Each structure stands twice: as structure tokens, then as C-alpha cells.
């Protein structure tokens, strides 16, 4: 039997039985990306499939944007169960699926596709994955928190904001370098966040501000949870996400960056006496929820956690 390759291509997908027919298990799940070699999804999903007794292999597929629509159609012809989707395809897949969940529709992005006959069903597990991660890390629900999201204008930030709004968080502060993007998102989320039957507190429940220290300082007194939804922190030379002087012991800090495990933001939070966690738990839970979307049964989450941790060394 042949070894599973690190990455398969669009040309492979066009002749899927020829490209994968001699594998031990049929390759019926994948992750689409461009690039895709960095994806840790196979290290999570393949142990889970084995533990669940499902005869299936999960592989990486390098799909370029121009080939995306045809690649999605080929899934139906090649007996796929589904696929995950990573950069840069989440918006393109959103436009191509036949049906989608409410959270995917509101975010405008799909990261998980299930094949159902001749239909493609889209979901976004990044958003509910964040919800699960916050619960696991801090034993708190989004609905009970006043939340600041830094980088709300990006894809990860919008996913976080939509989930917080759908859960009716106590307060939502959207921070973005281009404040117009944060303001546009606030307008989209207004009806979810602003409850006419709920009395306003000492601060507005939905705010959009620029990514500037003075603007953030004005809001920080009325914030419990700070979420970094930017890529700032991946390099040691990166600037501060939040000025260290603004972080207080009562704050909860969640950094979606997970490599390095201890970013500057996490270090600053811990030095301030605040609880902090990196994005590894969100990566895990979005995978768990994707598995459950495909199979409509509980995923072996701890098996997936072990695979993910082993992939990181």
C-alpha cells in the first residue's frame, strides 16, 4: 500500500481514484488551502477517525482560487464526506455552497463543507470553536462577558464578533486599524447586540474604535475579556496588541495566535496578574465541531487534542 502524501493537488483530485486508490483507507476528507502544507488538521482528524472506527483518510489538498469551484464539484463525484477550508478560500466557498448555517451566513465565510448527495452544506466552526475555547480556558460563557476584539475587521475577528453577538454578550468593543471596517461590522451586528428590553449600563453595549492606545484606554474599564484576532504576536519583533499598562488583574486575555505558545500579549497579561490563554484550544474545538458536523456524532476530542499537541512537538 502507498504512503499518504503530505499534499495532493487539483490534478490529483480530477483523478482521485487513481491518485489515492492504493491507500490503506479511502481518502474522503480533506482541507483545501493555498498554501496548505502547514495545516495541522490531518494530525487531529486521522487519529479521531481511527478512534471512531471510521474507515477514512483525511488529506491536504492544494487548491488555487481559480480551481475552487470545480474542486468543490469534484468532491461530489469522488465520494467525499466533506472538506475543511483554510486561507484564502473561506469567502469563495461561502459563495459556492448550496446551503449554510446561520453562523456561516452572518460571518460570510465557510470553513467546513459537508457533501450531502448533490448538495454542499457549509458551516463555520471557527466561531463556535472560540465559544468552546473560552469556556474551557476561563470557565465563562460569552453571554456573561464584556468583550473587546482587536482586529475585528479581519476574517477571524468577524467570526469572533458574530459569535459574541449571537450569544448576546454583555458588551462588545470592536477594535480595528481601519475603524470604518469596525463601524460597518457594528452596524451588521446591531440587532443582535442591542436588546430593546435590556437596560443600558454605564457604557454603550456596542462600540467601534480605532486600534489606538487612547481609544482602547477609554473602554478598558468596561471590558472583561480581550481577544486578539490579529496575527500580531507571531514574531518576536511584533508591537504590542494592547498596551501592557492597560491590562488589569481582572481581565481575561485570549490570543488566537498559538505559535509561539507564549506571545508578548500573553506574557504581558500574566505579568499583570491576568488569566491568559493562546489559540490552541480554538484550533482544537473548530476541528471537533467540524468532525461532528460531518458525522452527526460526538468527536473523540481528547484524541484530537493529543494529535494536535504531538504535531506541535
Where do the model's predicted regions map?
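NAD(P)-binding Rossmann-fold cofactor-contacting core
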Residues: 167-202
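Phosphate/diphosphate ligand-binding glycine-rich loop within oxidoreductases
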Residues: 9, 14-139
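Adenosine-phosphate binding glycine-rich loop
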Residues: 252, 256-313
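Glycine-rich adenosine-cofactor-binding loop
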Residues: 32-35, 122-127, 134, 138, ...
Amino acid at each position: 500500500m502507498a504512503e499518504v502524501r503530505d499534499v495532493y493537488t487539483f490534478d490529483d483530485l480530477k483523478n482521485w481514484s487513481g491518485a489515492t486508490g492504493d491507500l490503506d483507507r479511502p481518502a474522503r476528507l480533506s482541507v483545501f488551502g493555498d498554501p496548505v502544507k502547514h495545516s495541522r488538521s490531518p494530525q487531529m482528524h486521522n487519529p479521531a477517525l481511527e478512534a471512531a472506527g471510521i474507515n477514512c483518510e483525511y488529506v491536504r489538498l492544494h487548491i488555487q482560487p481559480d480551481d475552487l469551484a470545480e474542486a468543490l464539484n469534484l468532491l461530489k463525484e469522488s465520494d467525499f464526506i466533506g472538506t475543511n477550508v483554510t486561507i484564502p478560500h473561506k469567502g469563495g466557498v461561502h459563495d459556492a455552497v448550496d446551503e449554510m448555517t446561520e453562523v456561516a451566513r452572518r460571518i460570510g465565510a465557510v470553513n467546513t463543507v459537508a457533501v450531502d448527495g448533490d448538495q454542499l452544506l457549509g458551516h463555520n466552526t471557527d466561531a463556535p470553536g472560540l465559544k468552546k475555547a473560552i469556556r474551557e480556558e476561563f470557565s465563562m460563557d460569552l453571554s456573561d462577558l464584556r468583550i473587546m476584539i482587536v482586529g475585528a475587521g479581519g476574517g477571524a475577528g468577524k467570526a469572533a464578533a458574530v459569535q459574541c453577538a449571537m450569544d448576546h454578550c454583555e458588551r462588545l468593543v470592536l477594535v480595528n486599524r481601519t475603524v470604518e471596517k469596525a463601524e460597518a461590522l457594528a452596524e451588521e451586528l446591531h440587532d443582535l447586540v442591542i436588546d430593546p428590553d435590556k437596560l443600558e449600563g454605564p457604557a454603550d453595549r456596542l462600540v467601534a474604535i480605532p486600534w489606538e492606545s487612547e481609544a482602547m484606554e477609554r473602554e478598558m474599564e468596561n471590558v472583561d475579556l480581550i481577544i486578539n484576532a490579529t496575527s500580531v504576536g507571531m514574531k518576536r519583533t511584533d508591537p504590542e496588541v494592547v498596551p501592557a499598562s492597560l491590562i488589569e488583574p481582572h481581565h481575561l486575555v485570549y490570543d488566537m495566535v498559538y505559535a509561539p505558545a507564549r506571545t508578548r500579549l500573553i506574557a504581558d497579561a500574566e505579568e499583570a496578574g491576568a488569566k491568559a490563554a493562546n489559540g490552541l484550544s480554538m484550533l482544537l474545538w473548530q476541528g471537533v465541531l467540524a468532525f461532528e458536523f460531518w458525522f452527526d456524532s460526538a468527536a473523540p476530542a481528547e484524541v484530537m487534542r493529543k494529535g494536535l499537541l504531538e504535531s506541535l512537538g
